[in-house]
UniProtKB/Swiss-Prot annotation:
Residues 970-989, 1058-1090, 1125-1147, 1178-1208, 1444-1500 are annotated as: Disordered. It comes from Canis lupus familiaris. Interacts with RASA1. Interacts with the general transcription factor GTF2I, the interaction sequesters GTF2I in the cytoplasm. Residues 783-947 form the pG2 pseudoGTPase domain. Pfam families: FF_RHG35_4th (PF23083), Ras (PF00071), RhoGAP (PF00620), RhoGAP-FF1 (PF16512), RhoGAP_pG1_pG2 (PF19518). This is Rho GTPase-activating protein 35.
């Protein structure tokens, strides 16, 4: 377009021609000067549209194409640009070149035959239909590119860009190029058009060439030079804009920027765009598996992406993307590598934890060793392709196993070396710990209680400090101290038991005197076990006081062997063996309308009662209902805070009959209020017929809301409360008691315990009052007490098995869990024997207060404390009561090898000889003895029955004589049996908190014999009348249950017996001032009779004399007098002849016998500490009451000692004398010899008896021992008849366990163990676990699920409970049940059905707590649950459908007996047991667990 049209408003258009060196290779060299690249960059500046290669060698066809169009110039197209002054313009770009024929390598012939210099200077260009040029690829493929023609087919050139290549061109001389350029410039100058020199390829420029080019330009007038680089896109636009400015003089002059400055700006622009683009890529691309195609589509619209692609091109953008992907992949691989390297030490610990195995192996050998391990594939994976980071394994996120080729890397080798070093250090530290512990155990300087500071210098050395911190040694030392202290305490407790005679001789009470404590320390002071606790004197004294409390207040809770107290074991055994009487009387109990109602009095001043009542009501439901053991009870509270004599504060009202009372105090004043209120309440009801408040159950509670358990005031209140509780015979709770919470008076657990105790009291009252019980009790012929020592190394189950499993053994009707009834043939007749099985400490309280016909006393031959307790017990037993001593041994071998056993056996036999008792020994390891061994003893008891009963009745009758006439005549008067509720000696001030011996068993069976004997007495208008009334009361009056001792003290001098004389003379009885029974504290334990022929001088007081026909066929009468029942009505003389005369008057021959004495006087081995008994005043140590002292003073005035003679009044009819019916026969029976037994060795195991979690691992969830046993049984014993039922040899089982404990790789088949031995050892493993395999909390859920009636729902519920098992328990349980299921499939051969197996296994797997009634009644449920697990094993553990039951499953014990071969063969008739109740007696779970040999022994 002509410049003349510039004035047009249209956008100005400029035509620019780019010229420079062109021609053949000879002229220009191997490459051009960059004219095409310059044009390309300016016309299409985007990096993707920029092409570096533009060839000038064309074929004829390409030369003739529409793009070249047979011309030696190229039309690059039209470009719009905004110049510096923001004026837009258009530019048509033409490049003058010279195309070479690709065949002749000569310039193509064209319409213009001029040389290049002249053609390039042409200002008028014409070429019809010539197309715009893009790149070389366009030639021949014009249709694939945009087709845009040169406007009008012609152009008028407005200016020239003269290009000079300043790079080092191949085969080109720069000087020659400069000459060519000079000639071309001269030609261009002739056109008068603007010219701008463009230096191309400055990015590769040579400094001299650039300088020469500038020199050339300076030599020309106004010739401007622009340094450019088309490849780097530097100053390209500047060159064209400079030319446009020269063309259009009106435009401002363009500033020419040097190349390096422009390059810096361009580089900064590219760097900024690159940063933005990389940020965009990092934000979008997170996974190294992303591909460019999908990511570029996501970035297409992003300006960061567009700017960078414009500047650098798509390829560079892709390259950056690939670099980012590579970086992500590298980071991913490194993360995986770190995970693998972190897991590698764990793999080493799991696969090669034994240092001895790898200590001397190289890394290569270790790799081979790892591959041989069974769990190798659990930790490692061997890849087919290596290395692992170049395979797809890096993307396998689910597989966390370590690639095995990682072991070849340096970090893995370093970790292996670190593992080796760690094992070596651990071994050394373990050696140091072991050496330190051995040092502790062997050092004589380490004693219990020695502080670490004192012990450190004796046991520490430099090696210890080098390997372990001192804190580690202190921890080991602390544990060692705890062990030796616990051991010393146990040994000291055993020492106290070995001196039981001392404690009982001292007659200690709740507050022993300093003198008696001094005696104890003097006696025990030389014992090494006493000295062992010399640094723990406070704890030693506490143990002594605790033992004194046990002696003074013996209960199951205070027993040193608690919770393994014999009483608890006996209750469990008997309750498991029989249905309890309370169950049989349940219907009668339910008939009581008040059975579900509890009336509770809360006594406490200053708001204590109201506050506790509010707390209890807060625990109740909205309608004052309280839940106890799942049953709802109506709770009625009566808080009392004022004077109880007022009707408004009375304990009972016409509508409120209290069942118990909670007494609260927090100060001395409130405690005094409680005592005064209780005494007033009892006094107000004294003498009433409904006098039940005297025996109201009481609980004394110290309220301490602040939770402070220290301080002198609090300790003083506790001591005073304990003393008051002792006097009131009630339970005491102090702030330190379990269950008392901070800020509260009492918590829900404690409330439940109190209410349960009240319910038990109500039930016992109803039970004792039942008519059936009285009838049964009256039919008992003999009452025998069997005494066992708590803590003896024998099983009560084995000792009592012949008794409880005997066919003649029945449940006692007294409601006691400590007694049974036996019907045994003794002599010519069967006798009903009530056998009470008690601990020694429970038996002490009944020696003088209960009627007992004989004692069977057991002791362990290898335990000193056992024989010591026996000696202490026998000291206070009357010598008329037969004694059977039973020594328990470990067998003949043990007796021969053990000096202690021999000595104790010998001593027991000597004691038996000296007291005319019987002696036998029983081997504990072979408890196959029968009741026949006691028959000689029972015969002795029958022979001495009359004198025992008469002596006991005389003691009660003598006390009964002090009551008023109203007592004997009133049908509602208290029975003399009530005296048995009170203790006879000071050591029994506080009775046990649980009833061990029935109060109604003292005398009722005497009536049959004594009513007959009393008819033989002549002229029995005196004492005989009283006796007949007394016996009548025994037959008709039912005694109440155990009642607390009344707080009122009595003086024996009030018991005036002179009314006996008045009754004979005046025909009437004189009432006594006291209308209450004499308490046992009112007479001396030596109130027995002695022979009349011992009286040799006149008596100044009358004595009680009574006689009983010795033998009616021989006419013998034994006359015995009491030396201590003094009369108050004058004195007289008497002689032996008078006694003989009175006897001869009845025509009877008199035989004289001695007074009953205690066994301590007959045996030299008993009462070795008797001297201490007389060293101190009889009675309470620090609280000796004035009444007791007065009694002693009065007693000492008339006579002293057992042999003192009391004057006897001679006048009056001898028929008024008191008569004792007694018969004394002394016989000696042959003593059975003990049978030998096998000694059981013991060892400490690190495998058996430890928690299950210690013998399993996540990799090996089944204990190795169980796995070996089951594999052996399934391989050899599935066809064994009675597998798991027939017991293996005990010694072999122990040998198996011991050998396995030493070598876990033990081969059972090689050792030739029997199947039954292996089976028994496997069951023993589960029995010895600290917790049962089926956890206790899961057992509750299982029982609840079992209650569901629908079978399918029940099984699904059980399966849900099974999922809650701890993982270790679940895996082992699944393994065992699956094995039992397999065993049951062979039941046709082995006779072990799923039911039989469940009977054998449920106690082993569940081990329920039989101390609760719920557990006892659920035993059948437990067995059924295990049976279901075995039957439905595929359903429970292997996701199989529920299988149908195999035929009719026995639902009753009788059915069980028909299918289980090892149950008793005795015919049994029983009804199916109701749900949640124990099975009938013959098929109780305990019986099923006992050896079959013993169960067959029912017939005696």
């Amino acid at each position: 377009m002509m410049m003349a049209r510039k004035q047009d408003v249209r956008i100005p258009t400029y035509n620019i021609s780019v010229v420079g060196l062109s021609g053949t290779e000879k002229e220009k060299g191997q490459c051009g000067i960059g004219k095409s690249c310059l044009c390309n960059r300016f016309v299409r500046p985007s990096a993707d549209e920029f092409h570096l290669d533009h060839t000038s060698v064309l074929s004829t066809s390409d030369f003739g194409g529409r793009v070249v169009n047979n011309d030696h110039f190229l039309y690059w197209g039209e470009v719009s640009r905004s110049l510096e002054d923001c004026v837009e313009c258009k530019m048509h770009i033409v490049e003058q070149t010279e195309f070479i024929d690709d065949q002749t390598f000569q310039p193509h012939r064209s319409t213009a035959l001029q040389p290049y210099i002249k053609r390039a200077a042409a200002t008028k260009l014409a070429s019809a239909e010539k197309l715009m040029y893009f790149c070389t690829d366009q030639l021949g493929l014009e249709q694939d590119f945009e087709q845009k023609q040169m406007p009008d087919g012609k152009l008028l050139i407005d200016g020239f860009l003269l290009g000079i290549d300043v790079s080092r061109g191949m085969n080109r001389n720069f000087d020659d190029q400069l000459k060519f350029v000079s000639n071309l410039y001269n030609q261009l100058a002739k056109t008068k058009k603007p010219i701008v020199v463009v230096l191309t390829k400055c990015d590769e420029g040579v400094e001299r060439y650039i300088r020469d080019a500038h020199t050339f330009a300076l030599s020309k007038k106004n010739l401007q030079v622009v340094e450019t680089s088309a490849r780097s896109n530097v100053n390209v636009d500047l060159a064209f804009s400079t030319l446009v400015q020269l063309i259009d003089k009106s435009r401002g002059k363009t500033k020419i920027i040097p190349y390096f400055e422009a390059l810096k700006q361009q580089s900064q622009q590219i760097a900024t765009a690159k940063d933005k683009y990389e940020w965009l890529v990092s934000r979008i691309v997170k996974n190294h598996n992303e591909n460019w195609l999908s990511v570029s589509r996501k970035m297409q619209a992003s300006p960061e992406y567009q700017d960078y692609v414009y500047l650098e091109g798509t390829q560079k953008a892709k390259k950056l993307f690939l670099q980012h992907i590579h970086r992500l992949k590298h980071e991913h691989i490194e993360r995986r590598r770190k995970l693998y390297l972190a897991a590698l030490p764990l793999a080493f610990e799991a696969l090669i934890p034994n240092l001895d195995e790898i200590d001397h192996l190289s890394c290569i050998k270790t790799k081979k060793l790892l591959e041989t391990k069974p769990e190798f594939l659990k930790w490692f994976v061997v890849l087919e392709e290596t290395p692992w980071d170049a395979t797809s394994h890096i993307d396998n996120m689910e597989n966390e196993r370590i690639p095995f080729d990682l072991m070849d890397t340096v970090p893995a080798e370093q970790l292996y070396e670190a593992h080796l070093e760690k094992l070596r250090n651990e071994r050394k530290r373990a050696e140091m710990r072991r050496a330190f512990k051995e040092n502790l155990e062997t050092s004589p300087f380490i004693t219990p209680g020695k502080p670490w500071e004192e012990a450190r210098s004796f046991i520490m050395n430099e090696d210890f400090y080098q390997w372990l911190e001192e804190s580690v040694y202190m921890d080991i030392y602390g544990k060692h101290q705890k062990q030796i202290i616990d051991k010393a305490k146990e040994e000291f407790q055993e020492l106290l038991l070995e001196y039981s005679e001392l404690f009982y001789e001292l007659e200690l009470d709740a507050k022993p005197s300093k003198e008696k404590m001094g005696v104890i320390q003097d006696v025990l002071g030389e014992e090494q076990r006493f000295k062992a606790l010399q640094k723990l004197q406070a704890e030693r004294d506490a143990l002594i006081l605790k033992h004194i409390h046990f002696v003074y207040h013996p209960t199951k809770e205070t027993c040193p062997s608690c919770p393994a107290c014999v009483d608890a074991k006996i209750e469990h055994l008997i309750s498991s063996r029989f249905i309890r009487p309370s169950d049989r009387n349940q219907k009668n109990s339910l008939s009581d309308p008040n059975i579900d109602r509890i009336n509770l009095v809360i006594l406490g001043k200053d708001g204590l009662a109201r506050e506790l009542a509010n707390e209890i009501r807060a625990l109740c439901t909205n309608d004052d209902k309280y839940v106890i053991d799942g049953k709802m009870y109506e709770l009625s509270l009566r808080p009392i805070e004022g004077n109880v004599r007022l009707p408004v504060n009375s304990f009972q009202t016409p509508t409120f009959q209290p069942h118990g009372c909670l007494c609260l105090y927090n100060s001395k004043e409130s405690l005094s209020y409680v005592v005064e209120s209780i005494e007033k309440s009892r006094e107000s009801t004294l003498g009433r017929r409904d006098n039940h408040l005297v025996h109201l159950p009481l609980t004394l509670i110290l309220v301490n809301k602040r939770g402070d358990t220290s301080g002198e005031t609090l300790h003083s209140l506790i001591q005073q409360g304990q003393q008051i509780a002792s006097k009131l015979q009630c339970v005491f709770l102090d702030p330190a008691s379990a269950g008392i919470g901070y800020g509260r008076n009492i918590n829900e657990k404690q409330i439940s315990q109190v209410l349960k105790g009240l319910l038990d009291s109500k039930r016992n009252l109803n039970l004792v009052s039942s008519t059936a019980s009285i009838k049964d009790l009256a039919d008992v012929d003999l009452r025998i007490v069997m005494c066992l020592m708590c803590g003896d190394p024998f099983s009560a189950d084995d000792i009592l098995f012949p008794v409880l499993q005997s066919q003649t053994c029945k449940s006692s009707h007294c409601g006691s869990n400590n007694s049974v009834l036996l019907e045994l043939p003794i002599g010519l007749h069967k006798k009903r024997i009530e056998l009470s099985i008690l601990s020694y400490h429970s038996s002490f309280s009944i020696r003088k207060s209960r009627l007992v016909h004989g004692y069977i006393v057991f002791y362990s031959a290898k335990r000193k404390a056992s024989l010591a307790m026996l000696r202490a017990f026998l000291c206070e037993v009357q010598d008329i009561i037969p004694i059977q001593l039973v020594a328990l041994t470990d067998g003949a071998i043990d007796v021969l090898d053990n000096d202690l056993s021999r000595e104790q056996l010998s001593e027991g036999e000597e004691i038996a000889q000296e007291i005319d008792g019987r002696f036998t020994s029983i081997p504990c390891s072979q408890p196959q003895h029968k009741l026949e061994i006691f028959h000689p003893f029972f015969k002795d008891v029958v022979d001495k029955k009359n004198i025992i009963e008469a002596t006991h009745m005389y003691d009660n009758a003598a006390e009964a004589c002090s009551t008023t006439e109203e007592v004997f005549n009133s049908p509602r008067a208290g029975s003399p049996l009530c005296n048995s509720n009170l203790q006879d000696s000071e050591e029994d001030i506080e009775p046990p908190s649980y009833s061990l011996f029935r109060e109604d068993t003292s005398l009722p069976s005497l009536s049959k014999d004594h009513s007959k004997l009393s008819m033989e007495l002549e002229g029995n208008d005196g004492l005989s009348f009283i006796m007949s009334n007394f016996e009548s009361k025994l037959n008709n009056k039912v005694p109440p249950p155990v009642k607390p001792k009344p707080p009122v003290q009595f003086d024996i001098t009030k018991g005036d017996l002179s009314y006996l004389d008045q009754g004979h003379r005046d025909g009437q009885r004189k009432s006594v001032s006291s209308s209450t029974w004499l308490p046992p504290d009112g007479f001396d334990p030596s109130d027995y009779a002695e022979p009349m022929d011992a009286v040799v001088k006149p008596r100044n007081e009358e004595e009680n004399i009574y006689s009983v026909p010795h033998d009616s066929t021989q006419g013998k009468i034994i006359t015995i007098r009491n030396i201590n029942k003094a009369q108050s009505n004058g004195s007289g003389n008497g002689s032996d002849s008078e006694m003989d005369t009175s006897s001869l008057e009845r025509g009877r021959k008199v035989s004289i016998v001695s007074k009953p004495v205690l066994y301590r006087t007959r045996c030299s081995r008993l009462g070795r500490f008797a001297s201490y008994r007389t060293s101190f005043s009889v009675g309470s140590d620090d609280e000796l009451g004035p009444i007791r002292k007065k009694e002693e003073d009065q007693a000492s005035q008339g006579y002293k000692g057992d042999n003192a003679v009391i004057p006897y009044e001679t006048d009056e009819d001898p028929r008024r004398r008191n008569i004792l019916r007694s018969l004394r026969r002394n016989t000696k029976k042959p003593k059975p010899k003990p049978r030998p037994s096998i000694t059981k060795a013991t060892w400490e195991s690190n495998y058996f008896g430890v928690p299950l979690t210690t013998v399993v691992t996540p990799e090996k969830p089944i204990p190795v021992f169980i796995e070996r046993c089951i594999e052996y049984i399934e391989a050899t014993g599935l066809s064994t008849e009675g597998i798991y039922r027939v017991s293996g040899n005990k010694s072999e089982m122990e040998s198996l366990q011991r050998q396995f404990d030493q070598d876990h790789n033990l081969d059972l088949a090689e050792k030739d163990f029997t199947v039954n031995t292996v089976a028994g050892a496997m069951k023993s493993f589960f029995s010895e676990l600290p917790d049962p395999l089926v956890p206790y909390n899961m057992q509750i859920d299982l029982v609840e699920a079992h209650k569901i009636n629908d079978r399918e729902q029940k099984l699904h519920a059980l399966k849900e409970v099974l999922k809650k098992f701890p993982k270790e328990n679940h895996e082992v349980f699944k393994y065992v049940i699956s094995h039992l299921n397999k065993v049951s499939h062979n039941n046709k051969v082995n006779l072990m059905t799923s039911e039989n197996l469940s009977i054998c296994f449920w106690p082993t797997l569940m081990r329920p707590d039989f101390s609760t009634m719920d557990a006892l009644t659920a035993t059948r449920t437990y067995q059924t649950i295990i049976e279901l697990f075995i039957q439905q094993c595929p359903f429970f553990f292997h996701n199989r459908p529920i299988s149908e039951p195999p035929g009719a499953t026995p639902s009753s014990p009788s059915a069980v007996a028909s299918t289980v071969p090892f149950l008793t063969s005795t015919p049994v008739t029983s009804q199916p047991s109701p749900p949640q109740s124990p099975p009938p007696t013959p098929q109780s779970p305990m019986q099923a667990l006992l050896p079959s040999q013993l169960q067959a022994e029912h017939t005696l």
